């Protein structure tokens, strides 16, 4: 068979690491380890065609991260076992009809803590992303040290379209990783970008095909993959005096289509960036 045809067929099959013989102790995740000592964490939400971050999923995710803290594998790769994509975001159905702001804040705080715990792992963490990586899914990816995109992947923070903004630390991580004007524009508009654009921005470290995933993962875990680093322009644009000027311009642009009294979320995001971006810990806590 022609090699090009073979490559097309191979790239339709997700590379999910070692075969998992049983479901293990988790309902929504599968955890195994390959011959290189790399843990493969597969996100496969039970009874759903797409992965979303619900309260029960995040509770179990926290248990998985705790297990990784104890096992200390050579590294961990996080993948979706769903053909539809990586993670489609938070399960917003859990917040419909909520009347007590304190309950919502508590739920968000718990989710935030899980993502922070993932970021704090003292082993290489690699997100391998296919399909849609949106909202909370991008929050998970940003908490990893490396991000590898499969051609065709799409990235974005659509929360603003729901009257929200990234609430699990993604705003802090995103604006410190890539040009904050680009990052803020994406968050303020809710637009998505493809894998190539994500690579050019520095959001992902590599774009590859399924047949090359294992090699890309090894390169990331063992330090052979060149990781995207924030450039000098990113540092300059995040500098407080410059930030103030840019934030003022962002508010003016937002006001043209989204008055503050009707659409507070974009302005809350701009305020968050302007006030706290110089201190990541403060921005994460805000």
Describe each PLM feature range.
Residues 45-49, 94-95, 275-276:
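A short, flexible beta-alpha/helix-coil linker loop
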Residues 116, 174-175, 255-260:
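Short amphipathic alpha-helical boundary/capping segments
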Residues 36-42, 58-102, 113-130, 150-154:
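A structural preference for short, pocket-lining loop segments at secondary-structure junctions
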Residues 89, 105-108, 112, 135, ...:
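Glycine-rich phosphate-binding loop at the start of an alpha helix
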Residues 119-234:
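Crotonase-fold acyl-CoA enzyme core
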Residues 2-42, 139, 186-286:
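Amphipathic alpha-helical segments at domain termini/boundaries
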């Amino acid at each position: 068979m022609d090699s090009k045809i073979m490559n097309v067929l191979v790239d339709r099959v997700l590379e999910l690491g070692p075969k998992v013989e049983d479901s293990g102790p988790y309902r929504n995740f599968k955890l195994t380890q390959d011959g290189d000592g790399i843990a493969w964490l597969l996100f496969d939400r039970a009874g759903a065609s797409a992965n979303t971050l619900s309260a029960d999923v995040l509770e179990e995710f926290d248990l998985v991260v705790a297990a990784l803290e104890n096992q200390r594998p050579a590294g961990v790769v996080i993948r979706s076992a769903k053909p539809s994509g990586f993670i489609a975001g938070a399960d917003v159905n859990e917040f419909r009809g909520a009347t007590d702001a304190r309950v919502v804040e508590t739920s968000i705080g718990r989710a935030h803590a899980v993502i922070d715990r993932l970021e704090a792992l003292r082993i290489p963490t690699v997100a391998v992303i296919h399909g849609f990586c949106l909202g909370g899914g991008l929050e998970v990816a940003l908490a990893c040290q490396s991000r590898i995109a499969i051609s065709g992947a799409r990235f974005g923070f659509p929360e603003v379209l729901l009257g929200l903004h990234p609430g699990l630390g993604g705003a802090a991580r995103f604006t410190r990783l890539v040009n904050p004007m680009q990052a803020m524009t994406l968050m303020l508009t809710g637009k998505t970008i493809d894998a190539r654009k994500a690579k050019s921005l520095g959001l992902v470290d590599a774009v590859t095909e399924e047949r090359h995933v294992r090699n890309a993962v090894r390169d990331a875990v063992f330090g052979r993959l060149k990781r995207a680093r924030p450039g000098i322009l990113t540092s300059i644009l995040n500098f407080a005096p410059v930030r103030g000027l840019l934030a003022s311009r962002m508010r003016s642009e937002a006001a043209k289509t989204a008055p503050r009294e009707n659409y507070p979320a974009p302005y809350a995001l701009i305020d968050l960036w302007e006030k706290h971006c110089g201190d990541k810990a403060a921005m994460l806590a805000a």
